[in-house]
């Protein structure tokens, strides 16, 4: 068990790193919020079979109030770290080892009943479930757990960014509010259920009915345009709104759609209701680096 701290862009985020018991989604303990595809899971399952090691933590969010976990994280982080390093993106990481059995017992008891939201790693989580069923073993076998990075939903350093869409299919968007620039368009999305659009060198803001802009954009606009066609064949994704504009200007796509960052409380609410969002609904930044911590899926496995 570890505490991880990352410093980036003037922010600090602290996480707990631990083994989390794998549970089917039907148990309503681990909550997904995005749909997955078969291809990526097949690749990840092959990697697990070959290595029998979790090489990077999956990222989960939890509501820390009244759990005591954020307080444990803060106490541990008050001392000198065991490891400090700079990641490839210039982010600064620090890692503390939690070796106190009393803390282990307290945190394990809390995690046993804690509902968590998958932030990043839907494909890997479902792969880990498949691997656990494949290898079998007793209920407490290492393969029945996954390496988890757990972040309090209220952590001030938690950053989620929107992913913008560029549609390659022909499209006509009407009923929008004209805007003079990309910056003005993005500013107009804050606090609204709306999407920005760019087509034929013109920006618009498209008001949408509903609670979550991304869901309504797909339900009311993109799905109507594509019909029964696979959206993954006609959509491009980028976190850079300027890139989306360039793709349209260069003829790579016919229209760009811009979104504001999602409200994580709304995402959690939908996940608790059993509803999933379209692909690439969220982008959490920065992600935990691969290889920071390993977790053996066999007790006698040597690294």
Identify the role of each PLM range.
Residues 1-303:
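Surface-exposed, charge/polar-rich loops and edge strands
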């Amino acid at each position: 068990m570890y505490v991880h701290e990352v410093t980036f862009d003037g922010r600090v985020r602290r996480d707990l790193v631990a083994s989390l018991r794998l549970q089917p989604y039907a148990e309503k303990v681990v909550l997904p919020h995005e749909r997955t595809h078969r291809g990526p899971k097949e690749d990840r399952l092959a990697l697990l079979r070959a290595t029998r090691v979790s090489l990077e933590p999956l990222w989960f969010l939890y509501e820390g109030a009244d759990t005591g976990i954020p307080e444990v994280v803060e106490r541990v982080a008050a001392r000198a770290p065991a490891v400090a390093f700079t990641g490839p993106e210039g982010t600064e990481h620090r890692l503390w080892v939690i070796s106190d059995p009393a803390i282990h017992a307290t945190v394990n008891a809390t995690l046993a009943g804690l509902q968590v939201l998958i932030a990043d790693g839907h494909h890997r989580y479902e792969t880990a479930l498949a691997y656990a069923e494949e290898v079998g073993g007793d209920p407490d076998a290492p393969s029945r757990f996954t390496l988890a990075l757990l972040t309090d939903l209220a952590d001030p350093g938690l950053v989620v960014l929107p992913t913008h869409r560029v549609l390659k299919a022909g499209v006509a968007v009407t009923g929008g509010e004209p805007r003079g620039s990309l910056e003005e368009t993005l500013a107009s999305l804050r606090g609204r259920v709306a999407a920005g659009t760019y087509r034929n060198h013109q920006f618009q803001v498209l008001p949408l009915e509903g609670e979550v802009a991304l869901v309504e954009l797909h339900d009311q606009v993109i799905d109507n345009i594509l019909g029964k066609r696979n959206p993954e064949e006609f959509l491009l994704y980028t976190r850079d709104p300027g890139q989306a504009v360039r793709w349209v200007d260069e003829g790579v796509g016919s229209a760009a759609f811009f979104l504001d960052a999602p409200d994580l409380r709304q995402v959690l609410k939908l996940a608790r209701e059993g509803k999933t969002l379209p692909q690439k609904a969220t982008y959490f930044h920065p992600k935990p680096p691969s290889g920071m911590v390993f977790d053996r899926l066999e007790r006698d496995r040597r690294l």
